[in-house]
Amino acid sequence: MIEIKQVKTQDEVNYTFVEKLMHTAFPQEERRDTVQQREYSDNNLRFCNNIILENGNSIGMISYWTMGDFYYIEHFAIDPSLRNGGYGKRVLEMIKKQLKGPIVLEVEEPNDEMSTRRIHFYKRLEFTLHKKPYMQPPYRKGDNGLPMLLMTYGDIDMESDFEKVKKTLYKDCLLYTSPSPRDPKTS
């Protein structure tokens, strides 16, 4: 049985698994620094950093933000030794039921086989690809933004809400200059 469990730094074993998987699955420019990630995990009320367990065994991680009008999946990864085993599909089906609201996530532009496959994976799970220009802001001062695309699931009209969603992500989640993660009203 798969379980998605919020994890904080005090849970050293599970948090260490999540942190190592994030560092393996995402290059530095696609994730915040370790200190800030830990701070958000422990203190930001809108940020949920989760370990994915199957029968008590660690198999992956997923982090998302509660944004009011939608949820934003920031990072999702299955242990590399377990990929292509159907876990990703099962976890996203669970998340879609648990979150009970529109979901937004970022994907790399389809410039290679892996990014194309990832987009098709999300499409099979009923996510819609939006081709409007979108730049993921840098996680660190001095880094460059990354060209990405947004995908959505659920009742969200990106024709009219794209700019609002983008501004919310920029303001509340992604900028290294964002306010202190301790203040859920401004973080």
Stretches found by the model and what they are:
Residues F26-N49, L53:
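Active-site rim helix/loop that mediates acceptor-substrate recognition in acyltransferases
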Residues P110-K131:
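Conserved active-site alpha-helix within GNAT-family acetyltransferase domains
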Residues L129-D161:
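A contiguous, mid-protein "functional segment" used to position or interact
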